[in-house]
Amino acid sequence: MKLEFHHINYVSKDVDALHKFYVDILKMDDIAPQNFPRTDATDKTGYAGHIKFATEGSMQMHLAEQDFDVAARNGRHINPVERGHIAFRTNDIEAFKAHLSANGIEYADYGTAFAAEWHQIFFYDPEGNIIEVHQQVV
């Protein structure tokens, strides 16, 4: 099972202003949102918040509109767009879930509720920081 760093997610009440800061001040490149196909959110599943993306070439930043109700709306116990998170990509999400379970770490499996091409799970580190691990499913 391979694991590699993928992105940092920051949440904001003003995604456009945050994105402008990273692009204009830190000179990061914009990543077009069509590179990240999303699922359609409903009143019971998914996430319809505003998202923008930036990169310095190797690492991505996902800048998302803060939403305190995502976990409840999706029937999960971890909310990845309340405070933000760091993310890793794996080539075997099922093996990684088994690894977490074997170590007594609970996780929230969002499947493809947020991103049409990623199976995402979220869990907490010992300090309460949210970590995402996803596998590309296309």
Where are these regions (language model features)?
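A short acidic-to-branched-hydrophobic micro-motif
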Residues: 61-65
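Vicinal oxygen chelate
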Residues: 1, 5-13, 49-57, 73-138
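Hydrophobic side chains in well-ordered alpha-helices
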Residues: 18-21, 96-100
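Core segments of cupin and vicinal oxygen chelate
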Residues: 11-59
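A short, acidic/glycine-rich surface segment
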Residues: 37-42, 69-74, 109
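Short glycine-aromatic motifs
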Residues: 2-3, 28
